[in-house]
UniProtKB/Swiss-Prot annotation:
Quaternary organization: Homodimer; disulfide-linked. Interacts with PPP1R16B. Interacts with TSPAN8; this interaction recruits the endothelin converting enzyme ECE1 to tetraspanin-enriched microdomains and positively modulates its enzymatic activity.
Lineage: Eukaryota, Metazoa, Chordata, Craniata, Vertebrata
Cysteine pairs bridged by disulfides in the record: 98-103, 121-754, 129-714, 184-434, 643-766
Gene: Ece1
GO cellular component terms listed in the entry, alphabetical order: cell surface; endosome; external side of plasma membrane; Golgi apparatus; perinuclear region of cytoplasm; Weibel-Palade body
Species, as recorded: Mus musculus (Mouse)
Bilayer disposition of the protein: Single-pass type II membrane protein
Residue positions of the active site: 607, 670
UniProt protein name: Endothelin-converting enzyme 1
Keyword tags: Cell membrane, Disulfide bond, Glycoprotein, Hydrolase, Membrane, Metal-binding, Metalloprotease, Phosphoprotein, Protease, Signal-anchor, Transmembrane, Transmembrane helix, Zinc
Binding residues annotated for Zn(2+), in chain numbering: 606, 610, 666
Cofactor note: Binds 1 zinc ion per subunit.
């Protein structure tokens, strides 16, 4: 505590009351050293012994001595009372109010988002976001809207300016991104070509029975081409990534795939999803007609067969909540063993074709996620008519590539999106579509332009400091856990210490020569949008295949710099924060740190906690999947997490329950991230002193921290989009990301004085980290 120099303290000093002042300042020493009969310099004797001897001493006093003792006692008591009052005044004194333009602006934004008529102890999400929700209905052309969307819109506008500015590019790779974007914007040329580019591609691949004759014996060839050259994944997905059990090497990985709809649930719960299934079939028929299929009566039965085949795939697909234990689903086999497991595919020719020029032999290691799925999909392929198999593979190609064609295909997409996600049809500016597609495919190529335009030089250092504070806070909490044994705790701390931070962008993109080297084999052609997209699919697979004989590289990010997101990589044990998210509302230099810790601080804590969620905890500090926990702590962890499974499973949206097991990892990260960020903010205040408060709000800085956290998640969704999120998204709905985390926080309840048993302060709370 800082010394307070008040007018009363000055007056006491001026009175020359040296004896009393000295006694007060040395009070602790006096109590420790006094014994019976100790005498002070003023001749006053004080005795702490038995009351009987004290009574005898008092009786022996003269009346003058007695009056002096009483007077001294009263004066001492008065002084103590004054000092106590000063201390209370200091403790409760309201910090100064920040009245800068930035503080007034952020206050206005906070107030506009809030609904102060809602009791924060009843429903904090509505209290924090009620005003925002009323002012932000889902915009036309969207199925959901939130603070992330606002920031992405801002980033899109920046990217548009850069792509349209010829002087913004320095490297050849950046210029390729600009050529790609301009080709997308050339609607005149796209409308001239109509469906011709895709129809020619279909013919080149042997035809499609829906639009014309097809080559009847080309199953293996078609599968190889659509997988490698056009990045589709019929039946299963094949990719290259770090080996979970040997993270220093890359390995071929095979997993379940092949559904046209976002989840198996859409196919299997037919009554609930009848509208979507009908809309999907109509969409399939419409694309078939646009590609020259002719009579709808001839197209619809064949499209229904494709839909039925996808339903059969959905039946053998493993639900996501049953795939969370990676130790159980990881299987390493050889190419020869894979051939025995799934004989419907000629695996060696298939792998040698898609990974050319890398040579694959029978001993090639391959990681398979879920052997039973591959066994059953092989049987399904063998038992299915060849014409239907070809129709299905070509449908995968059409579904992936039709959006690069003329407006008729865009209209068909929009009509299905309205059924699927509740998206209202609207005339979204073409540039937004083209910016998104260019960023999605060539985000690293345009990355340097975006970084130079938006990312301040010291942002990496500031973000690094915040990450360091969050790590420290997480490790402090780790040291207090009662359910974890000491050996596992030490290993967990080592893992936390070893987490690598990647901030803003991968270093190679800022070196024009290095960037050009990466994109050297990709060529964008002026005014041929479809061709450019197909070339990119082929190029991106070649880049993937090229990694097979190389070691994993930290500079290979899974997100581009403009992305408004962040992630944790278990095999690299690293957390990644693209430049796109290091902006308001997550971080602003001029905002109180309560908001910054509640924003980007919680994001950092969230990603850090992923290293210790139900999946991340299975990886050690070097990124290897192995059992490094003692069994007692594994069982205790499962007990702690079961609480969260039950808690979140009790939440529902429009009468549909949240899947607490499917969302477990994200819920652990949300709760752990909030706790770590709050603790880090308290450490910051201890080090730097209390912050200025914001005007009008009447909130303390601690309350502002929780409010800032909640307002990051203000969002709205259509009912259709909410349904899709509940069955596909590993994150809980935004409302419950706020309510679930805060209702588990004792500190939140204390700062908002929520009565025990109130909705935001339940008696039973869940805590893992």
């Amino acid at each position: 505590m800082r010394t307070v120099w008040s007018p009363l303290a000055a007056a006491l000093a001026a009175l020359g009351m040296s004896t009393y002042k000295r006694a007060t300042l040395d009070e602790e020493d006096l109590v420790d050293s006094l014994s019976e009969g100790d005498v002070y310099p003023n001749g006053l004797q004080v005795n702490f012994r038995s009351s009987r001897s004290g009574q005898r001493c008092w009786a022996a006093r003269t009346s003058v001595e007695k009056r002096l003792v009483v007077l001294v006692t009263l004066l001492a008591a008065g002084l103590v009372a004054c000092l106590a009052a000063l201390g209370i005044q200091y403790q409760t004194r309201t910090p100064p109010v920040c009245l800068t333009e930035a503080c007034v602006s952020v206050t206005s934004s906070i107030l506009n988002s809030m609904d102060p008529t809602v009791d924060p102890c009843q429903d904090f999400f509505s209290y924090a976001c009620g005003g925002w929700i009323k002012a932000n209905p889902v915009p036309d052309g969207h199925s959901r809207w939130g603070t992330f969307s606002n920031l992405w819109e801002h980033n899109q506008a920046v990217i548009k300016h850069l792509l349209e500015n010829a002087t913004a590019s320095v490297s050849e790779a950046e210029r390729k991104a600009q050529v790609y974007y301009r080709a997308c914007m050339n609607e005149t040329r796209i409308e001239e070509l109509r469906a011709k580019p895709l129809m020619e591609l279909i013919e080149k691949l042997g035809g499609w029975n829906i639009t014309g004759p097809w080559a009847k014996d080309n199953f293996q060839d078609t599968l190889q081409v659509v997988t490698a050259h056009y990045r589709t994944s019929p039946f299963f997905s094949v990719y290259v990534s770090a080996d979970s059990k040997n993270s220093n090497s890359n390995v071929i990985q095979v997993d379940q795939s092949g559904l046209g709809l976002p989840s198996r649930d859409y196919y299997l719960n037919k009554t609930e999803n009848e509208k979507v299934l009908t809309g999907y079939l109509n969409y399939m028929v419409q694309l078939g007609k646009l590609l020259g299929g002719g009579d709808e009566d001839a197209i619809r039965p064949q499209m229904q067969q494709i839909l039925d085949f996808e339903t059969a795939l959905a039946n053998i697909t493993i639900p996501q909540e049953k795939r969370r234990d990676e130790e159980l689903i990881y299987h390493k086999v050889t190419a020869a063993e894979l051939q025995t497991l799934a004989p419907a595919i000629n695996w060696l020719p298939f792998l040698n074709t898609i990974f050319y020029p890398v040579e694959i032999n029978e001993s090639e290691p391959i990681v398979v996620y879920d052997k039973e799925y591959l066994r059953q999909v092989s049987t399904l392929i063998n038992n299915t008519d060849k014409c239907l198999l070809n129709n299905y593979m070509m449908w995968n190609l059409v579904r992936k590539t039709s959006s690069f064609l003329d407006q008729r295909f865009q209209d068909a997409d929009e009509k299905f999106m309205e059924v699927m996600y509740g998206t209202k049809k609207t005339c979204i500016p073409r540039w937004k579509f083209c910016v998104s597609d260019t960023e999605n495919n060539l985000g690293f190529a345009l990355g340097p332009m975006f970084v130079k335009a938006t990312f301040a030089e010291d942002s990496k250092n500031i973000a690094s400091e915040i990450i360091m504070e969050i790590k420290k806070a997480f490790e402090e909490s780790l040291s207090t856990l009662k359910w974890m044994d000491e050996e596992t705790r030490r290993s967990a701390k080592e893992k936390a210490d070893a987490i690598y931070n990647m901030i803003g962008y991968p270093n190679f993109i800022m070196d024009p020569k290095e960037l050009d080297k990466v994109f050297n084999d990709y060529t964008a052609v002026p005014d041929l949008y479809f061709e450019n997209a197909m070339r990119f699919f082929n190029f991106s697979w070649r880049v993937t295949a090229d990694q097979l004989r190389k070691a994993p590289n930290r500079d290979q990010w899974s997100m581009t710099p403009p992305m408004v997101n962040a992630y944790y990589s278990p095999t690299k044990n690293e957390i990644v924060f693209p430049a796109g998210i290091l902006q308001a509302p997550f971080y602003t230099r001029s905002s109180p740190n309560a908001l910054n810790f509640g924003g980007i601080g919680v994001v950092v804590g969230h990603e850090l906690t992923h290293a210790f969620d139900d999946q991340g905890r299975e990886y050690d500090k070097d990124g290897n999947l192995r059992p490094w926990w003692k069994n007692s702590s594994v069982e205790a962890f499962k007990q702690q997490t079961e609480c969260m499974v039950q808690q979140y499973s009790n939440y529902s949206v429009n009468g549909e329950p949240v899947n607490g097991r499917h969302t477990l990892g994200e819920n652990i990260a949300d709760n752990g991230g909030l706790k770590a960020a709050y603790r880090a903010y308290q450490n910051w205040v201890k080090k730097n002193g209390a912050e200025q408060t914001l005007p009008t709000l009447g909130l303390t800085s601690n309350q502002l921290f929780f409010l800032g956290f909640a307002q990051v998640w203000c969002s709205v969704r259509t009912p259709e989009s909410s349904h899709e999120g509940l069955i596909t998204d590993p994150h809980s709905p935004s409302r419950f990301r706020v309510i679930g985390s805060l209702s588990n926080s004792k500190e939140f309840s204390e700062h908002f004085r929520c009565p025990p048993g109130s909705p935001m302060n339940p008696h039973h709370k869940c805590e893992v980290w």
